[in-house]
UniProtKB/Swiss-Prot annotation:
It comes from Brucella anthropi (strain ATCC 49188 / DSM 6882 / CCUG 24695 / JCM 21032 / LMG 3331 / NBRC 15819 / NCTC 12168 / Alc 37) (Ochrobactrum anthropi). Its main location: cytoplasm. This is Pantothenate kinase. It is found in: Cytoplasm. Belongs to the prokaryotic pantothenate kinase family. Pfam families: PRK. HAMAP family: Pantothen_kinase_1. It is an enzyme of class 2 (transferase).
Amino acid sequence: MWEKVDQLTPSRYSPYRFFSAEEWAGFRADTPLTLTYDEVKRLRSLGDPIDLDEVRRIYLSLSRLLSAHVEASQLLFEQRKQFLNMEESFKTPFIIGIAGSVAVGKSTTARILKELLARWPSSPKVDLVTTDGFLYPNAVLREQNMMERKGFPESYDVGAVLRFLSAIKAGMSQVRAPLYSHLSYDVLPGEYQIVDKPDILIFEGINVLQVRDLPEDGKMVPFVSDFFDFSIYIDAESQLIHKWYIDRFMRLRETAFVNPESFFHRYSQLSEDAARSIGEGLWNNINLKNLKDNILPTRPRADLILRKGSDHLIEEVALRKI
């Protein structure tokens, strides 16, 4: 199943170590389970079957790994301060990037991790920001004929993303992240999430690991992932993601889309067959193309790949070698 990850190199030369879910679960050690059944149910996205068993099996080991990375990062920061004779006392937040296709479960992973990390014995301050708010407003996308490219790299204000992450890394206070409404399917004008000197920031979005073409003149061009201390890619076969996307679309048709204020309210008025046809078109013409052209190629850049099976649960893990 991992051939596509390692298609360019023989497995023994892979930059990753591969583990089954059962092997990965063994790395939990004595990491405590600090979430309840009801909390997991509240945190998971529509159609995501994650439960306490999955948290025990996958996320407790991941929490332990991230704890080790955060501790090592803090030690390195202190050593570098001494090396450079720095007197500044500001803290540099540890930033975790989470990438993957639409409907693959990024948001659930991000929310579960946020809660687990915030409950470490050290009680770190953990914030979660998604890239949705950094999309250009619909008015701008319409003006530039890009509504059907929404979610593609060019539909994001990358400059705003870079300024936000740079401010976070610089230890600035009261940094604003624009908010997005899935009801109106648009950025909320004048509304922001305030991120105030977190110990850990989780930054989640489909294209956060993407890079741009390098300039020929050697000028410094920052990438979003340059600000990450650790990155995670949520992976699955495209046909599975397709099924999850359509299943979610049809559920939303009977729930969120029923709201007259929903951008997609018109789909709730269609027959089941007509709505399914719309969903298939959105998948094939937009989301599948974005996955193949822009999202999947970033998978080898992740520090950790969580591979899901047909039941939407993680069955394999790839961890980059140090």
